[in-house]
């Protein structure tokens, strides 16, 4: 992958994920007990052999930039390897990026300094495993100018995606961004072919397309709305079907957009399945992250003799359960569960204390929260709604550093 440059779009506001994104960018939101959302895209790059990576930041990027510094300063600049966070440079005016294509257009000066022949455009806020090297190989074999990764989705969900129509050889014939009435697959009226927001461009094609698009006042400067539909008419654009054993990744069809509280919660809970739909345990595709140096998790008996219990849960380092009960939950590092406290079907971020006798059910608790003894959350939604955000499916979210 020496001839390819990765550009990760990591500047979105993530407003639907509020309050988890009130003080951090969406790609920096903790996930799965020890990771950040962007770790999955970065790991895919690392394991695919991509060693030149630009991360385009924008919205409340401090937490994201700190994570990149602490956990991803692993490449060797002397060998031309790097992961570089790029905040808006304001080289073409004072406004923030207007769309996905506009974000890269404003940084064409960086692309021009690179001798890569191909650009891999990625999003920093999806959960999945994918070998981009296999996609690039197919891009080269077909002589494509643009390759779009895609997957089958139920037609009822397709309006949230760019939907494609393709020929038998994979040539893209049509592309409609978030259509009200999505076209279906020729052989399956219950499914549509959806773009995953993963693109491989020939460098010269991308530069020209972005430059021409920037001249159009009527453009939304977005890949799905503007760039891809136009390239279909002038260049060879191919689809790359995601799913199955491609490259070095074990068979894995898992891809999730965690853009809402409910989808974020469900993706975390997927990790607790007896056989998780996404394999985090493939030894040669380990998900890398920054790991704080805490001692191993432990359970201890409380003063009343209660034993700390973990059942079907993910527990990070530094956790101490002193006579509490944790069931079907994800507990991040340096959390304290006190005597007779119960945590069920919940996600607890770093540095949280669950007070003695407290009950948490169907909750997400952000960092640095001290839950007082005998507090009930997720039991009475009417009372919870007076203090906290509750998702459409009833997940209660306690914001970072909330004071009871």
Swiss-Prot record:
Protein name per its UniProtKB record: Glucose-1-phosphate adenylyltransferase 2
Function summary: Involved in the biosynthesis of ADP-glucose, a building block required for the elongation reactions to produce glycogen. Catalyzes the reaction between ATP and alpha-D-glucose 1-phosphate (G1P) to produce pyrophosphate and ADP-Glc.
Family statement: Belongs to the bacterial/plant glucose-1-phosphate adenylyltransferase family.
Recorded catalytic activity of this chain's protein: alpha-D-glucose 1-phosphate + ATP + H(+) = ADP-alpha-D-glucose + diphosphate
Transmembrane segments: none
Pathway(s) this gene product operates in, as recorded in its UniProt entry: Glycan biosynthesis; glycogen biosynthesis
Alphabetical GO biological process terms: glycogen biosynthetic process
Organism: Vibrio parahaemolyticus serotype O3:K6 (strain RIMD 2210633)
UniProt enzyme class: transferase
Lineage: Bacteria, Pseudomonadati, Pseudomonadota, Gammaproteobacteria, Vibrionales
Entry EC number(s): 2.7.7.27
InterPro entries, A to Z: ADP-Glc_PPase, ADP_Glu_pyroP_CS, GlgC_bac, GlmU/GlgC-like_hexapep, NTP_transferase_dom, Nucleotide-diphossugar_trans, Trimer_LpxA-like_sf
GO molecular function terms listed in the Swiss-Prot or TrEMBL record: ATP binding; glucose-1-phosphate adenylyltransferase activity
Assembly, per entry: Homotetramer.
Domain of life: Bacteria
Sequence positions that bind alpha-D-glucose 1-phosphate: 97, 162, 177-178, 195
PROSITE patterns in alphabetical order: ADP_GLC_PYROPHOSPH_1 (PS00808), ADP_GLC_PYROPHOSPH_2 (PS00809), ADP_GLC_PYROPHOSPH_3 (PS00810)
Gene name tied to this protein: glgC2
Keywords assigned by UniProt, alphabetized: ATP-binding, Carbohydrate metabolism, Glycogen biosynthesis, Glycogen metabolism, Nucleotide-binding, Nucleotidyltransferase, Transferase
Nucleotidyltransferase keyword on record: yes
């Amino acid at each position: 992958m020496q001839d390819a440059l990765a550009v990760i779009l990591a500047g979105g506001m993530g407003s639907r994920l509020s309050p988890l994104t009130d003080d951090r960018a969406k790609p920096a939101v903790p996930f799965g007990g020890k990771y950040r959302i962007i770790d999955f895209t970065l790991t895919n790059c690392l394991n695919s052999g991509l060693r030149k990576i630009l991360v385009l930041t924008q919205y409340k990027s401090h937490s994201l930039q700190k994570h990149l510094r602490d956990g991803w300063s692993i490449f060797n600049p002397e060998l031309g390897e790097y992961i570089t966070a790029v905040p808006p440079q304001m080289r073409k005016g004072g406004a923030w990026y207007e769309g996905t294509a506009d974000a890269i257009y404003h940084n064409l000066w960086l692309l021009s300094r690179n001798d890569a022949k191909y650009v891999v455009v990625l999003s920093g806020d999806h959960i999945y495993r994918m070998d981009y090297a296999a996609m690039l190989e197919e891009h080269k074999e077909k002589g494509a100018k643009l390759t779009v990764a895609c997957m089958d989705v139920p037609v009822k969900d397709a309006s949230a995606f760019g939907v494609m129509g393709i020929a038998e050889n994979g040539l893209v014939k049509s592309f409609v961004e978030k259509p009200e009435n999505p076209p279906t697959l020729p052989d399956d009226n219950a499914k549509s072919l959806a773009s995953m927001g993963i693109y491989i461009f020939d460098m010269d094609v991308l530069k020209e397309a972005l430059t021409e698009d920037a001249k159009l006042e009527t453009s939304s400067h977005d890949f799905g709305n503007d760039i891809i539909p136009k390239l279909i008419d002038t260049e060879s654009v191919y689809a790359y079907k995601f799913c199955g054993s491609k490259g070095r990744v074990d068979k894995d069809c898992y891809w999730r957009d965690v853009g809402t509280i409910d989808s974020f919660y469900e993706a975390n809970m997927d990790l607790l399945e007896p056989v998780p739909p996404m394999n985090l345990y493939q030894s040669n595709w380990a998900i890398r992250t920054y790991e704080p140096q805490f001692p191993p998790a432990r359970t201890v008996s409380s003063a009343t003799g209660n034993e700390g219990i973990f059942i079907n849960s993910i527990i990070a380092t530094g956790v101490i359960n002193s006579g509490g009960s944790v069931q079907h939950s994800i507990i991040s590092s340096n959390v304290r569960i006190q005597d007779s406290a119960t945590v069920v079907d919940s996600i607890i971020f770093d540095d949280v204390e669950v007070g003695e006798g407290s009950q948490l059910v169907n909750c997400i608790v952000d960092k640095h929260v001290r839950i007082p003894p005998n507090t009930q959350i997720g039991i009475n939604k009417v009372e919870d709604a007076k203090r906290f955000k509750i998702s459409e499916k009833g997940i209660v979210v306690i914001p970072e550093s909330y004071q009871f």
